[in-house]
Amino acid sequence: MSEQNQPLLEVRNLSVEYQTDELLVKAVNNVSLSVNRRETIGLVGETGAGKTTLAMTMMGLLPKGIGKVTGGEVLFDGVNLLSLRNADMMAYRGKVLSMIFQDPMTSLNPVIPVGRQVAEVLELHNEKHLTKEQIDERVDEMFRLVGIPPERKTEFPHQFSGGMKQRVVIAISLACEPELLIADEPTTALDVTIQAQVLAMMTGLKEKLGTSMIMITHDLGIVAETCDKVAVMYAGEIVESGTVEDIFEGEKHHPYTEGLFGSIPRLDIETDRLQPIEGLIADPSNLPSGCHFHPRCPYATETCTCQAPPAVAEGEHVICCHRFAKGEQE
């Protein structure tokens, strides 16, 4: 097996719950996925699907006293991150495993110069015993890599636009050249033209540094442009996964994936109304029985309401749906 086809990260049967004062929220339910070296996997789904909770669990950042892992493993290069003490996890977080959060506006400390914020990461993980001058040189290098003039490193976050703030966040995330980067909706707060610039930059840096990446998004266009594989999440579960070709060019899809594609406006077809997925996403504190998507599914049968769907695989393409298990699809 080549190095590129070796799993760097393996999530096995992971389940995560949040306990509030009144409700038990089942945010992630028996999720399994793997990311190979130098590979980018897109994690797609509506708001509330469990994507961010999955990412925060990988990073060891679940809120204490509320979030709880109830089962499963997160293996990074063979080490179960869930079994590590917080002090040991600190050695991984930021150095070999890094994350870009959704909103660059709130990810930076407003009273510390941006260059100092990049330098802090290098100082925290200074296993190469870099001198202050070498750290300053590395900060300059990272700023150049993300397209920011190094002389701006003494400025504060409020002096940067949203797109430039996100570039600073990316510089922080990649400063220690992590093996895996988790990007949680990295372009949501940015204008469309800036989104394209940031995505192109991230893709270029990924190739340059040899980094694996998990791209969390609800934008299928971003997935098609940047990812090698795709996992579609609904109600805390992965309902379909496969290569980008399987998802975007294949003929068989989970009904939820069909709904996601159907809700995208198309320029080649004249229409008066968009086609949203009917109904609301399942309440994670009161999940439907059987297939969690059955209340919104146009193909739902009585079996779907009472039995969890099996995983049906064709090569790397996996769909969790009774239709394909029974061969009922058209």
Residue ranges and their predicted role:
Residues M1-K252, I319, A325-E330:
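ABC transporter nucleotide-binding domains
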Residues N5-P7, T243-E330:
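Short catalytic/signature loops enriched in Gly
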